[in-house]
UniProtKB/Swiss-Prot annotation:
Biological process according to GO: L-arabinose catabolic process to xylulose 5-phosphate
Alphabetic keyword roster: Arabinose catabolism, ATP-binding, Carbohydrate metabolism, Kinase, Nucleotide-binding, Transferase
Protein name (database record): Ribulokinase
Catalyzed reactions per annotation: D-ribulose + ATP = D-ribulose 5-phosphate + ADP + H(+); L-ribulose + ATP = L-ribulose 5-phosphate + ADP + H(+)
Gene: araB
One Pfam family linked to the record: FGGY_C
Cellular component per GO, a single term: cytoplasm
HAMAP family linked to this entry: Ribulokinase
Highest taxon, organism lineage: Bacteria
The species this protein was found in: Klebsiella pneumoniae (strain 342)
Enzyme Commission no: 2.7.1.16
């Protein structure tokens, strides 16, 4: 029986999953945390800098793969036919002429600018705004029209420009820049040199301004106008061709075959972003909105080319032919914070406990156990008394806003507090905020003529916290399907590996056998949905008002009258 392995590189850890190709049975899984990241190395949260050392990825991947393989029998290990890879994104890094990430070299070993710039790094806000302005110049080609019309600080070129401006040593040493989801398959197949490395359609189309209609990347003149420093240090074009993730980039290199005890015939599929492969693992069909929920969310919708036509959807994170399933248009949206908002509130409430633990070391374990119960206790308390009459209205922009209309200058806003607001009520407001953000994304599609036939949710929060999911269901006022697998992203990567290895002819055929099932379907509660509708309208009014306070200073005065009117309706 052929076995495929999926690798899912998340923000905190990497997951490896072995899947039987014929049945979709999940045979073994392993999760390995990134050791340097776990210690907070190379990050500066106050300044929105989040970097991953490449050794974190390499060491954790090897440990996860070896753990999974150790759980298989010798016969099963011999049946491994392919490895697929997904990752967060945009998470690019500078590489040298051999394709080594610069931080793997001694002189750059502790330089954060020589590492992978994690998706949620927002140090490049000004660079992103400059790219957006350049794309919208009258009379010129709008290279942002297939990525929603706004270039984000979370994306490829903004990060490259920021690091190139900030660090001349890295700029001089970098032969190219590579997305994590493209670099790992190249590492495993021994094809890391920039001229050998295959760039994925997913990362290139959604984050790098690549599109077939203008021949790939924007012309050199575009980057010269943005800032000549890019073309001074990097050869244009950085790349030309892209590949969908079902196409193998090669087979397992001799080095990695020896390290893992696998055959060199194991196919390595192309890479893609985690949420895109998660949608495939969830078995998504056209016009299903799939919410991959974790620290943030990524929302994926696929549509057939004929139904989309020449339409461009504004305010999303891109529409790319083949970024999810080959021959379909993949559309991406998302919330910059979801689980991270709940974790923030837990840290706020846990601060006194941390102080007590320092003062009373003997109570440390008991206090640690109490901290772990904070959020479950808050969830239960709000579920037992879910009053919506005095619910704080919160804007879920704690890490900026990804969709609709990316804006990483935005901050979280909490409104409608009074002296009776307690911790469960405020936590309920945070739950509602994440649900409101989810609805805003759904409406971004439907109001522009892209139908949403059903909504699916996957990930740990989706399966383990029905209170939060029911609130989302009520706010959306639609049935909400909860996907059974906890490991849909890794499962999706395994599905691509199976196709790359030739076990199946295409992704839909592999999905029929390997994709996860729906575990349960939640239904909206009419009374709650009606009350949430009123609160959602207030959320929208506050959004209009609050956003004006985070505009670049030159635009604030011009927008002021609109913000004052928003809350008088």
């Amino acid at each position: 029986m052929a076995i495929a392995i999926g690798l899912d590189f998340g923000s905190d850890s990497v997951r490896a999953l072995a899947v039987e190709c014929a049945s979709g049975a999940e045979l073994a899984a392993s999760v390995e945390w990134y050791p340097r990241w776990r210690e907070g190395q190379y990050c500066d949260g106050a300044n929105n800098r989040f970097r991953h050392h490449p050794r974190d990825y390499i060491e954790s991947m090897e440990a996860a793969l070896k753990s999974v393989l150790a759980s298989l029998s010798a016969e099963q290990r011999a049946d491994v036919v392919g490895i697929g890879v997904d990752s967060t994104g945009s998470t690019p890094a500078p590489v040298d002429a051999e394709g080594n990430v610069l931080a793997l070299r001694e002189e750059f070993a502790d330089n954060p600018n020589a590492m992978f710039v994690l998706w949620k790094d927002h140090t490049a806000v000004e660079e992103a705004e400059a790219i957006t302005r350049l794309c919208h110049q009258p009379g010129k080609e709008d290279y942002s029209r297939y990525i929603g019309g706004i270039y984000s600080s979370e994306w490829f070129w903004a990060k490259i420009l920021h690091v190139t401006r900030e660090d001349s040593a890295v700029a001089q040493a970098a032969a190219s820049w590579v997305e994590l989801c493209d670099w790992v398959p190249a590492l495993l197949s021994g094809t890391t040199r920039p001229q050998d490395l295959r760039r994925g359609r997913c990362s290139a189309g959604h984050k790098s301004l690549w599109h077939e209609s203008w021949g790939g990347l924007p012309p050199a003149s575009f980057f010269d106008e943005l800032d000549p420093i890019i073309n001074q240090h990097l050869a244009w074009p950085l790349f030309t061709d892209t590949w969908t993730a079902d196409v193998p980039v090669g087979t397992l290199s001799a080095e990695w075959a020896q390290r893992l005890g696998l055959s060199q015939t194991v196919a390595i599929s192309g890479g893609a972003f985690d949420c895109h492969m998660g949608a495939v693992g969830a078995g998504a069909q056209p016009n299903a909105l799939v919410k991959v929920i974790g620290t943030s969310t990524c929302d994926i919708l696929i549509a057939d080319k004929e139904s989309v036509g020449e339409r461009t959807v504004k305010g999303i994170c891109g529409q790319v032919d083949g970024s999810v399933v080959p021959h379909f248009i993949g559309m991406e949206a998302g919330q910059s914070a979801f689980g991270d908002i709940y974790a923030w509130f837990g840290r706020i409430l846990g601060w006194p406990l941390e102080q007590l633990a320092q003062q009373q070391p003997a109570l440390r374990e008991q206090i640690k156990a109490s901290q772990k119960q904070l959020l479950p206790a808050l969830t239960e308390a709000w579920a037992n008394n879910p009053s919506l009459d005095h619910l704080p209205v919160v804007l879920d922009w704690f890490n900026g806003r990804r969709t609709p209309n990316a804006n990483q200058r935005l901050k979280g806003v909490i409104t409608d507090l009074n002296l009776a607001t307690d911790a469960p009520a405020l936590f309920g407001g945070l739950i509602a905020a994440t649900a409101f953000g989810a609805r805003a994304i759904m409406e971004c599609f439907t109001e522009q003529g892209i139908p949403v036939n059903n909504v699916m949710a996957l990930g740990g929060i989706a399966r383990k916290n029905q209170v939060i999911m029911q609130a989302c269901c009520d706010v959306l006022n639609r049935p909400l399907q909860i996907v059974a697998s906890d490991q849909c992203c890794a499962l999706g990567a395994a599905i691509f590996a199976a196709v790359a290895a030739g076990v199946y002819d295409d992704i839909p055929a592999a999905q029929q056998r390997m994709a996860s099932q729906v575990e349960t379907t939640l239904q909206p509660r009419p009374a709650q949905a009606q009350r949430f509708e009123q609160l959602y309208q207030r959320y929208q009014q506050w959004s209009i008002s609050a956003e004006q306070h985070y505009l670049p200073s030159a635009a604030k005065a011009e927008k002021a009258p609109q913000s004052q009117a928003a809350l008088t309706h």
